[in-house]
Amino acid sequence: MTEEPEFSLGVEEEYLLVDAETGDLREAPDALMEACKAELADQVGPEFLRCQIEIGTPVAADVAQARDHLARLRGSIARHAAEFGLAPISVACHPVADWRAQGRTDKDRYNQISQEMGGVARRMLICGMHVHVGISDKDMRIDLMNQFSWFLPHLLALSASSPFWLGEDTLLASYRTTVFAGYPRTGLPPRLGSWAEFDRSVEMLTETGIIQDASKIWWDLRPSARFPTLETRVCDACPRLDDAITLVALVQATLRMLWRLSRQNLRWRQYDNFLLGENRWRATRYGSTEGLIDFGSRRILPFDEIAESWLAAIAEDADALDSQPAVAGLRDMIARGSAAERQRALFASAITAGATPQEAFRSIVGWLIDEFRRDL
C-alpha cells in the first residue's frame, strides 16, 4: 500500500430547475434535455424527478481541471435553460416546493427505486454533490474509507444548504440529510477489514435479491460501484461553484494526507459510528455554527479552530496536489457562513423590510440563481 494513488477527481452535482421569474420549480422540457445532451453528451442527464438535472464531470487530473469542467457544465446548462425561461439552482432543498406535486422521470432505474421504496422515494426532492477520488488499490480504498469517516460531518457542516422545507424553517441546516435517511443502507459507512469483506457483504445482498448491485448502497462514503474511486456522498448541493470546489479540494487533500500517514505506519484517529454519528447530527442540525466534538480533548471546538487544524494537517498534501488556493477557500466559507445561514439571513432581512413570506422565499430563490452563475 505504498504506491501513491492517482487521486484523480470526478464530481457529480444535482440541480433544480426553476422559473426564472417566479422561482417556482419547473419540469425540464424534453427540448431542453435534448439541447444539453447534444452539447454535453453523457455528462448530463435526468434525475429521479423531472425538475432535476444531474451532471457528472469527466475525470480530472487535478482540482483546477475539475473546476474547469464544473464551470463549463454549469454554464452550459444555465445558457440552455435560459432559452426556456428557466434557471438552474444548486441547493439541497427548494425552500417552498411540494414534493407531492413533482413528476417522476420515466427511467427503468428510477421506476424500480420508486417501486421498492414507495412513499420514501417520492419525497426525494433533494440534491447533493458527490466527489470521486481515484484510488486503484481496492484494499487501500477500504482502509482510507475507514479513516476518512471522521471528516464526513465536517464536510456536511460546510455544505449545509437546506434549512427550509415546504415553506417552513426546519431549524436544521441540512434537512436533506433527514429526507435521504428514509432510504436503507445510508449514513456513515461501517468499518470494514478489507475489500474482501466488503465484497462478501455486497454478494450476500445481491444473491438474496435485496439489491441488484453495489450502486444501491447509499452510504455517505462508499467504494464506487462503477469506478475505481472512493465516492464522498455526504454533501448538500452547493449554490456557489467555488464553494463546491473548495470541498472537492478538501476531500482530495485529506485522502492524500491519510495515505501519507499510512506510509509511515500511522493512522488517523478512529472512533466508532456512535460517536461520529453525534458529530453528523450536529452538522445536520447546526451546520458549522455550533462546532463539532473533538473526542480526544472531550470538547466542542468552534469551526474556525477545526478549520485551522484541518488546513495544517493537509498543507503538505495541498502543496503536492497544487490545490492550495482551493483548500484555503475553507476560511472564506466559514467567514461567510453556510448556505443555510445565508438563506435564513435573506429571509429575515426581507421580512424585516416588509416582504410577505412568499416574497421572502422568492428572494432566496433569486439569490440562488445568482449564486449558480457566480464564478463561472
Swiss-Prot record:
Biological-process GO terms, alphabetical: modified amino acid biosynthetic process
Name of the molecule in the record: Putative glutamate--cysteine ligase 2
Keyword ATP-binding among UniProt keywords: yes
InterPro entries named among the record's database cross-references: GCL_type2/YbdK_subfam, GCS2, Gln_synth/guanido_kin_cat_dom, YbdK
Entry keywords, A to Z: ATP-binding, Ligase, Nucleotide-binding
Domain of life of the source: Bacteria
Pfam family of the protein (one): GCS2
Family membership: Belongs to the glutamate--cysteine ligase type 2 family. YbdK subfamily.
Catalytic activity: L-cysteine + L-glutamate + ATP = gamma-L-glutamyl-L-cysteine + ADP + phosphate + H(+)
Keyword presence, ATP-binding: yes
Functional summary from the UniProt entry: ATP-dependent carboxylate-amine ligase which exhibits weak glutamate--cysteine ligase activity.
EC number(s) reported in the record: 6.3.2.2
